[in-house]
A protein has these predicted regions:
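A short hydrophobic/small-residue beta-strand
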Residues: 185-187, 365, 450
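ALDH superfamily catalytic-core signature
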Residues: 237, 245-390, 453
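Glycine-rich loop-to-alpha-helix module at the N-terminal edge of alpha/beta enzyme cores
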Residues: 46-136
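Residue-level signal for inorganic ion chemistry
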Residues: 24, 43, 81, 103, ...
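Rossmann-like NAD(P) dinucleotide-binding subdomain of oxidoreductase/dehydrogenase enzymes
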Residues: 137-283, 410
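Hydrophobic face of amphipathic alpha-helices that form TPR/SEL1-like repeat modules
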Residues: 1-42, 67
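Short, well-ordered beta-strand elements within core beta-sheets of diverse protein domains
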Residues: 46-52, 69-73, 161, 272-276, ...
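Conserved C-terminal structural/oligomerization subdomain of aldehyde/semialdehyde dehydrogenase
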Residues: 44-48, 235, 328-329, 355, ...
Length: 496
């Protein structure tokens, strides 16, 4: 369908939006400051983007507040907001190539992953929430004969949304779709590594009919724009996907400002358990490789810990090493590449340091581990597998956010569960077993928000996504996500 040359030609002429969108207008940062947006796969400067700070966040929040208090969006009938959001989903698909290319150039992912997964997935999220709007009902409480008590969901007001760089368009959609569907106004702060698809999405939202000021985008550095959003007294709720350490800052910002609601989806160190009664070890090995090497391992729910029953350990690892060879990184614009570039030099350096530290801790390097240079960029790392990993090693405990897998053996079901749950994170887990009783037992005991049985990292917009412990709280996707963007309102009527 596409060739490398097709994507290269489009990349050569791609337009990059380099200004904030505030109140329906594109504008530079008030300070005039910019930051460089770099293609990690080539080290090419793509654009110098407005570096928003507190002054720009103030303007964006003021525009969002005016749109909410005075504009039509929050007061439209659900079916009217539905029509606008469905139109936005259609426009996203109409601009599928452009949006896919923006994310690929911006953060290094294979462009065909963005084309096949990210863009249609993000459009589907908008369409799903749009379709849900006229199918949600409020309640009437069973009160006394002379009273009527209604329980309704109402929008919160102004939502601050801070999203990461690993799935820029998808993560924006996960926050924006339910927030806008519920009638809120939003100020979106994309990661500084990947602002372009969010800025283009905001343009498309205006074209679809989202009123000016309802969706504002403030690119900028986290310690400036993100912090200002977290501290702003006119922001009613802050939703965040990113690292646990940054998530903790947003909790502090809420306490220091207006006690705004904060919803966090943070990191993970997700286990993948393979029991000896799994009959299709080849499939399990294929999925285990996908679970850690897809998107260069830059996935919050990546299955970065592999726990294998000792009786099949050696055979399974041999199969897995063969599957890992399919995930060698390549040019992200080459449709044949299954893995691309690491997002930037800082992340690359962090992954390489983790690999070196793991060897110093005594883990056995089974495969990969090398930094590669492709197209003049050294932001490429081989799929890396370590064996003999003890639970006290940093490799088993800290999120690396890269293509690095920690492999350990276990001797019993109880030991497997103990090792799996021995983590400060609780986002996701996978397990492989053909014993239905065991699958149910183990799934119930795993401390994770999502457990995938005989697959890895299962996901659908109709199913809530999120975790516990230091992976955060609250749920993205599905109907429960409306809880983050609405509040219950009780209204009493005294009847005569």
């Amino acid at each position: 369908m596409f060739e490398l040359s097709d994507w290269q030609r489009r990349a050569a002429t791609q337009r990059f939006i380099d200004q904030a969108l505030i109140g329906g207008r594109q504008r530079p940062a008030a300070s005039g400051a910019t930051f460089d947006a770099i293609d990690p796969a080539s080290n090419r400067l793509l654009a110098r983007v407005a570096a928003c700070d507190a002054a720009d966040v103030d303007a964006a929040v003021a525009a969002a507040r005016r749109a909410f208090d005075e504009g039509p969006w929050a007061r439209l009938a659900p079916v009217e907001r539905k029509r606008v959001l469905l139109r936005l989903a259609e426009l996203m698909l109409a601009h599928r190539e452009e949006l896919a290319l923006l994310d690929s150039l911006n953060m290094g992912k294979p462009v065909m992953d963005a084309w096949n997964i990210d863009v249609p997935g993000a459009a589907h999220v908008f369409a799903w929430y749009a379709e849900s709007l006229d199918k949600l009902y409020d309640q009437v409480a069973p009160t006394a004969q002379q009273t009527l008590a209604t329980i309704t969901r109402v929008p919160l007001g102004v939502i601050g949304a801070v999203v990461p760089w690993n799935f820029p368009l998808d993560m924006a959609a996960w926050k924006l779709a339910p927030a806008l569907a519920a009638g809120n106004s939003v100020v979106l702060k994309p990661a500084e590594q990947s602002p372009f698809s969010a800025l283009r999405l905001a343009e498309l939202a205006l074209e679809a009919g989202v009123p000016e000021g309802v969706l504002n985008v403030v690119p900028g550095l986290g310690e400036q724009a993100g912090k200002a959003l977290g501290l702003h007294p006119e922001v009613d709720a802050l939703v965040f996907t990113g690292s646990t350490e940054v998530g903790k800052y947003f909790m502090q910002y809420s306490a220091q400002s207006n006690l705004k609601q904060v919803w966090l989806e943070c990191g993970g160190k997700s286990p993948n358990l393979v029991f000896a009664d799994c009959r299709d070890l080849d499939l399990a090995a294929e999925k285990a490789a996908f679970g850690i090497f897809f998107n260069q391992g830059e996935v919050c729910s990546a299955n970065s810990r592999l726990l294998v029953e000792r009786s099949i350990h050696d055979e399974f690892v041999e199969r897995l090493l063969a599957k890992a060879r399919d995930w060698q990184p390549g040019d992200p614009l080459d449709p044949a590449s299954r893995a691309g570039a690491i997002v930037d030099r800082r992340q690359t350096a962090g992954i390489l340091a983790a690999i070196e530290r793991a060897q110093g801790e005594g883990a056995t390097l089974l495969g990969g581990g090398r930094q590669l240079t492709i197209n003049g960029s050294d932001n490429f790392i081989e799929p890396t597998l370590f064996g003999d990993v003890r639970p006290d090693m940093q490799l088993a405990r800290e999120e690396i956010f890269g293509p690095v897998l920690a492999i350990s053996a276990f001797d019993s079901e109880d030991e497997a569960i103990r090792l799996a749950n021995d983590s400060r994170y609780g986002l996701a887990a996978s397990l492989w077993s053909d014993d239905l009783h065991r699958a149910h037992r183990v799934a119930r005991r795993l401390n994770a928000g999502t457990v995938s049985v005989n697959t890895v990292d299962a996901l659908d917009v109709a199913v809530p996504f999120g975790g516990g412990k230091q992976s955060g709280f609250g749920r993205d996707l599905s109907l429960p996500s409306f809880d983050k963007y609405t509040q219950l309102k009780t209204t009493w009527f005294q009847l005569r």
